[in-house]
Structure formats: C-alpha cells, structure tokens
C-alpha cells in the first residue's frame, strides 16, 4: 500500500469517527484507538508534506496570527429574532402566525434550545469549508475562517453526497460547561485571565487573531439553519437540519416538532426544568414555523422574521434578605465583605452567601443589613447581589461598617486609596482597599500564603493541601513559609492524615523544594498581580533575585508585558521590610536558586537611551521625538544640560520647550539619572564603551519537548530550558533548534527528522543539562 493510499484511508476513517462522535453521539472506537490513527496520519503527512490537504483532520491546529480580521458581507442577512418573555407573548406570536397563514388546524413548529454562544456562518463550496464569518451587524461580519477550522466538530469536508455547490450553514459556536470549567482552571493555574461565563469564553476564543489560541480552546458548533444555498435541500426547517446532520454537521439533540403553541409551551417548560442538567448554557428556546412555504408567506418585518421567535428564560434571579455582612481576609490582607443571606433557591441551588467584592460595591448598591435584595447566580455559578429593593427596606436596616480590627487576628485594618499610574503621574481614584496589617501574624493571611507557596506551579511541595496547611498553622508549627524547612518528623507524625510514610514523604518533598528555578521562587512569594508568566519574565530578563529586588518601577517597565501598575506592585513588595525578612529567612533555610545568571543579552542590547527618554513623562515627546533628540545629544548629561537652542536643533519648538521644562525639575533629573544608573549597572548599555552582558547559553533558541520523560516532568524540563534562555514551543518548525524526545514521541519526532532538526533522548538531555551546571 502506498503512503498516499494509506493517508486517504486514515482520513476517511477519522472523518467517520468524528461524525459518529460529534454528530451522532455514538463513539465507534475508544479514544486511544482514535489517537493512534490520528498520530499515524500526522506522521505520514510529516513524511509526505506534499500530500497534506486543507480538509485533513490534522489541519486544525491553527496557523499564523493575523493583524486584523477582514470584513465579510452576508449575501443573505443574518437577522435577529423577536423575543417572548412571558407565555402571553408566545401566544400572541402564535395568534399572529395563524392569522398570517389563514389556515385551519395547528401550525407545525420546530423547537430548539437557544445556545448562549456566538452566531457564525460557514460557507461550503463543493463540499469544502472555504469561509467562516461572525454575524456582525447582520449584514457584514468578520472573516474568522482560520479559527472555525480549529473547532473540532465543524467538518472541513462534508460527508456523503448530494450537497449543493454552494451551501451556507448557520449556527452557534459555544463552550460546554465542562469545557469552560477546564479552560478557567487552566487559565487560573497559569496565572492568566479567567472568563466570567461560557459565552464570553467562546466569543473571546473565536475572535482571537492567533488561531493557535482558538485551537487550544474547547469550542463546539451547533447548526440551526442555512443562509445562501445554490439549490433546495428541503421543504421544512427540521428536514433541512436532518439533511445537514447527514452531511456531517452537528445539530441540537433537543430538536423537536410541536403542533401548535401549546406544545411549544410544553417544550419550553420541559427544557426549563432540565436547563441546569444540560451540558451547555442556554438562555431560552427558539420556535420556528416548520414549513418553508409558510415561512415565505409570513415574510419579515423590519429586521426580524415573522415566522420565528426566541422565548427567553427569566434571569436567574430571586429576592432574599441580607441577614448580615461578614468580612473575609485574603492572602494579601485584603478585607472583603460577604453577604450572609436568608437561604433562597436560585436556579435550583440554595444560596446563602453572595460576594460583595469591596466597600465600593456596597456603596454603589446602597446596601444595608436587613435589606431585601435581588440575587443572581452570574453565569449560573457565582451568586451576586444585583440590586437593593428600596421600597422593602425595614426601619431598622443598619449601614455596613468595615471593622477597625481584623476579624481573624485582631490587627488594625487600614484603608488605602487606590492609585492609578501613567508614566510619572499618579492619580488617586475614588476607590479604596481595606487591609489587615497583621501580615503573617494573621492566621488567614498565613494560611493562604503557605497554600500558594506550596502549590504545584510554585514550590510544588506534594502532600500539603489546604487542610494540611491549616492543621500545621493551627498547631503552631509554622508561622512563615521558612518554618516549613524547620519541620521535624516528630512534630508532624501523628497529625491527622500523617502516618510515618506520609510524614517522611512530606519532609522529602520539602527538602527537594530547596532547589527551585528563580521563576518558581518569585511566583511562590505571592507578589500581587505577578502570575506564573510574569515571574518567568522577571527571571528570564533580569537573571537574578538581587536584580529583581533592586529594580526601580520604571526599569521594570522595560520588561515584556510589565506595565507601570504591576511594576509598582513588584517594587513595593521588595521594598517592604516584612517581605525582605521573609525572603531572607527562606534564603537562610538553604534555598539554592538554580538558574541565576547574567541579564538576558537580547534584553540588554535592545535598551537604548532614546527608549529611556520616551518612557519619561515628557509632554509630546514619544519614541520618534526621543530618537531625534538622542541623535543630536547622545548622552543624558548633554540632554539635561542643553539650552533651548540645542534642543530646538533636534526637536520642534513645542517639544524642545517640554524637554527643557521637564529637566528644570531636580526631581525629574534625579529620576532620570537613577534609571540610567540602574540600567547601566544591570548591564544594559547605550555607550559603545559599555560591554554587553553575556547571554544565556540557549538565548534565541527554540526547543520542543515530546513524548514521556521518565526522570522529570515536562513542566520541570521546560523550566530548566527556559532558565538557560530557551523558548519552549509546542510544535516543530524550521526554526526549532533541538527536540527532546522521550518514549512515545510521535509526529513531532517525525517532523524533526524530516526537517533535520537535532534530537536528544532523555539521557543525552540530562547530560546536556549537567554540562550547563543544572542537576536533575
């Protein structure tokens, strides 16, 4: 059998498995067998790239990022539907339909859940998917073709035969509840942005300019109709959907037929009762006159059809009473209010607590203890207080007061005004945060700090979950993260959950954590607004804990993706005497940071005097003006000392005056000199006499990990490579420097062989790390 024949066989088999899994909901093979076939196809296509076609099941990984989406005009407008909020609204719709058709007997309707996602159009030509577009304003949408190709249950090629030359399919891209939970958990673990609800997650994922991001998101598609079609494919709405299903397009498993409005109402009530158990979010039900001839007879009004309506569910809201407002203390000491409610069922779940976020939210709501409020389960998950019902306020309703002492440790609670910073300016906002000043003497802060410190993405101390940490704190065995390294066997054994074996495993894990990467250590410190990726940026760019501790806020903004707000959080954290003491205690406990070294060479070389000037808050002087200024005056001293004549030879009069005015202020002179001094001390340069700091050994190299590593996890291997300056990618390309391949390596290994990329097995990789001074 030739490779081409086998590739065609595999594609056909995988397409059939996809159809049975996504459309019929009847998986025909175990996941492991599907993966084996898929990997075989990927490997064959890697060996024979000229045989790769756009409709191959392997072509869903996403391509190069776009600068912007292009516009797509809908040949048949994507109209919105009218809404019914009450049963009376639906009955009135039914009356209008009967009147418009003037026919005896009950009108036939199709019934489908209204998925809460993003409406899209898919265009197939001769059975091949050629375009995907958003609804937009109904007339013009955005071309998201690269992104829709990554959605697993959208067929790249239609099944069967008999499809028209041109077929535009319309439907909803959505995210299941389970997929949404997995995505948010992964985002939170990586220190990334989490989403408020599945709809936002689906919309944000589908509108990514980088389709590789879309490919990583658990999106699904459900077809609900057609747009332009070159020939008729049915005479009823349900008939068309069943035909689309036969061609491989997923339709709702809840699609039903109803005879008359009363059966529609019965469907609505049934779906409403089962709403919480459905695997996806819905916000109502859509009813359509089933006959296409009847649809044509009824026609349209304004921008909506007369033959369809969306019967919306009521918002997931209920009334209840605020019994009290209590205050919780978080890891950073923030004291936040929580409403204790008279228990009430909202969307089938009993709610007795609701978040109030902060005192600003309480002020916005005008909330008092004793008030009747509207509670909503936002996204059907997080109970929130939406509104106070003022007409029900009792005479004895009490204002909410922030405690002057911490409810956990009794320390003072301080109010701090929120500050917004932009370059050199500080703006005090109306908001404020309340914090317990007890630090690690506060049990709540200590427990949360330790839980964060030992977490998998931080110091990765296995065996210390939340309950274990709470127990160690409550027993008085740990009062700071450094106390973990003082724990003795006799102190731990016998505590709940700790027998002799588990105690020794815990102590071994604690000891092993003394050799973290710099990035892990920084992340474990729990600096406000510093997630895992920001910690990696700090470690990779600055190269040592000392530089991170010393860095001025303005210098930190030179690092990728660090703005002034986060820069001040980092700087203030390391300036704090209490935090300095905690860090020193950790270092004194035997901590050995594994990858400290020089400043990143590309970072040092990329910093210029013009770049520094552009970052100062000089009115009307941006990057271009700064370049002109430095071309004329090539040192900070010359710029500060320059008179109006010198400055006007480089800049327009307005800009020159702004520079002179800025540097008249001695505080601005000092700030600029301090920034320059630190940049030069760190190894950055803009003088030919300054030597560029040597880079890390793998700086500028891209590595790929594949297969199962037996002597370390993939995460640890990635950390070690990044500590040497490498970028770790998820796929092999011509730019890949080296592939580390463990047992079970598949298509990535084949791709590396095809491209002639260097490959190391695990033993060779461990030897390489040892040569770089990194132990495993």
From Swiss-Prot:
UniProt keyword Ligase present: yes
Obligatory cofactor(s): Mg(2+); Mn(2+)
UniProt keywords, alphabetically: DNA damage, DNA repair, DNA replication, Ligase, Magnesium, Manganese, Metal-binding, NAD, Zinc
Domain BRCT: 693-776
Catalytic activity: NAD(+) + (deoxyribonucleotide)n-3'-hydroxyl + 5'-phospho-(deoxyribonucleotide)m = (deoxyribonucleotide)n+m + AMP + beta-nicotinamide D-nucleotide
Gene Ontology cellular-component annotations: cytosol
A biological-process GO annotation: DNA replication
Disulfide bonding pattern of the chain: none
This enzyme's EC code(s): 6.5.1.2
Residues given in the record as NAD(+) binding sites: 31-35, 80-81, 112, 135, 172, 288, 312
Residues forming the catalytic site: 114
InterPro entries for this protein: BRCT_dom, BRCT_dom_sf, DisA/LigA_HHH, DNA_ligase, DNA_ligase_AS, DNA_ligase_CS, DNAligase_adenylation, DNAligase_N
PROSITE patterns: BRCT (PS50172), DNA_LIGASE_N1 (PS01055), DNA_LIGASE_N2 (PS01056)
SMART domains attached to this UniProt entry: BRCT, HhH1, LIGANc
Recorded GO MF terms: DNA binding; DNA ligase (NAD+) activity; metal ion binding
Residues holding Zn(2+): 406, 409, 436, 442
Function: DNA ligase that catalyzes the formation of phosphodiester linkages between 5'-phosphoryl and 3'-hydroxyl groups in double-stranded DNA using NAD as a coenzyme and as the energy source for the reaction. It is essential for DNA replication and repair of damaged DNA.
Xref: HAMAP family: DNA_ligase_A
Protein family (similarity comment): Belongs to the NAD-dependent DNA ligase family. LigA subfamily.
Protein name: DNA ligase
Gene (UniProt): ligA
């Amino acid at each position: 059998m030739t490779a081409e024949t086998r590739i065609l066989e595999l594609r056909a088999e995988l397409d059939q498995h996809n159809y049975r899994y996504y459309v019929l909901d009847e998986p025909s093979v175990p996941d492991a067998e599907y993966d084996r076939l898929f990997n075989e196809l990927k490997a064959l296509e890697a060996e024979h790239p000229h045989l790769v076609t756009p409709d191959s099941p392997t072509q869903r990984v996403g391509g190069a990022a776009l600068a912007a989406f292009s516009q797509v005009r809908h040949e048949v407008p994507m109209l919105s539907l009218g809404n019914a909020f009450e049963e009376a609204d639906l009955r009135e719709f039914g009356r209008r339909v009967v009147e418009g058709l003037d026919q005896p007997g009950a009108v036939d309707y199709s019934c489908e859940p209204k998925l809460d996602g993003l409406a899209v159009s898919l265009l197939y030509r001769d059975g091949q998917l050629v375009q995907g577009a958003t609804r937009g304003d109904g007339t013009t949408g955005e071309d998201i073709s690269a992104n829709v190709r990554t959605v697993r249950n959208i067929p790249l090629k239609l099944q069967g035969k008999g499809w028209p030359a041109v077929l535009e399919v319309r439907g909803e891209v959505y995210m299941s509840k389970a997929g949404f939970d997995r995505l948010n958990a992964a985002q939170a673990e990586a220190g990334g942005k989490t989403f408020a609800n599945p709809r936002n997650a689906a919309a944000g994922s589908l509108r990514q300019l980088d389709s590789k991001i879309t490919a990583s998101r658990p999106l699904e598609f459900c077809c609900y109709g057609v747009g332009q079609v070159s020939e008729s494919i049915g005479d009823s709405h349900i008939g068309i959907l069943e035909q689309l299903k036969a061609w491989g397009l997923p339709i709702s498993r809840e699609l039903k037929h109803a005879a008359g409005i009363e059966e529609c109402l019965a469907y609505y009530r049934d779906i409403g009762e089962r709403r919480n158990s459905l695997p996806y979010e819905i916000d109502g039900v859509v009813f359509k006159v089933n006959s296409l001839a009847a649809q044509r007879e009824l026609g349209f009004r304004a921008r909506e059809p007369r033959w369809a309506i969306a019967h919306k569910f009521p918002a997931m809201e209920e009334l209840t009473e605020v019994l009290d407002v209590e205050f919780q203390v978080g890891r950073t000491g923030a004291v936040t209010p929580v409403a204790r409610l008279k228990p009430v069922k909202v969307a089938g779940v009993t709610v007795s607590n609701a978040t109030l976020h902060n005192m600003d939210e309480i002020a916005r709501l005008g909330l008092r203890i004793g008030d009747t409020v509207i509670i909503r389960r936002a996204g059907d998950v997080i109970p929130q207080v939406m509104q106070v019902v003022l007409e029900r306020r009792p005479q004895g309703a009490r204002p909410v007061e922030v405690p002057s002492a911490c409810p956990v440790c009794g320390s003072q609670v301080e109010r701090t005004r929120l500050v917004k910073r932009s370059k050199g300016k500080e703006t005090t906002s109306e908001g404020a945060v309340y914090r317990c000043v007890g630090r690690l003497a506060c049990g709540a802060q200590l427990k949360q700090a330790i839980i964060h410190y030992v977490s998998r993405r931080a110091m990765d101390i296995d065996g210390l979950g939340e309950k274990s940490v709470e127990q160690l704190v409550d027993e008085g065995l740990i009062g700071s993260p450094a106390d973990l390294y003082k724990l003795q066997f006799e102190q731990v054994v016998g505590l709940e959950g700790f027998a002799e074996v588990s105690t020794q495993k815990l102590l071994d894990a604690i000891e092993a954590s003394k050799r973290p990467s710099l990035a892990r250590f920084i992340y474990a410190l729990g600096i406000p607004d510093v997630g895992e990726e920001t910690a990696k940026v700090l470690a990779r760019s600055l190269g040592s804990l000392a530089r991170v501790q010393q860095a001025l806020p303005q210098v930190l903004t030179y690092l990728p993706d660090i703005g002034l707000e986060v820069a001040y959080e980092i700087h203030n954290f390391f300036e704090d005497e209490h935090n300095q003491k905690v860090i020193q205690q950790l270092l004194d406990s035997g901590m050995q940071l594994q990858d400290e070294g020089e400043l990143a060479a590309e970072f040092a070389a990329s910093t210029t005097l013009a770049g520094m000037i552009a970052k100062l808050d000089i009115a009307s002087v941006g990057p271009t003006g700064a370049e002109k200024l430095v071309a004329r005056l090539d040192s900070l001293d010359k710029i500060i000392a320059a008179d109006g004549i010198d400055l006007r030879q480089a800049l327009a009069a307005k800009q020159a005056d702004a520079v002179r005015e800025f540097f008249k202020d001695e505080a601005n002179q000092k700030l600029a000199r301090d920034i320059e001094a630190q940049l030069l001390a760190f190894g950055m340069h803009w003088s030919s006499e300054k030597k560029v700091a040597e880079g890390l050994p793998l700086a500028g190299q891209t590595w790929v990990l594949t297969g199962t590593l037996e002597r370390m996890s993939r995460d640890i291997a990635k950390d070690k490579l990044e500590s040497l300056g490498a970028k770790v990618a998820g796929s092999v390309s011509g730019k890949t420097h080296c592939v580390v391949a463990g047992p079970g390596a598949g298509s990535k290994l084949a791709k590396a062989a095809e491209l002639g990329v260097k490959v190391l097995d695990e033993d060779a990789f461990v030897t390489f790390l040892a040569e770089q001074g990194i132990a495993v």
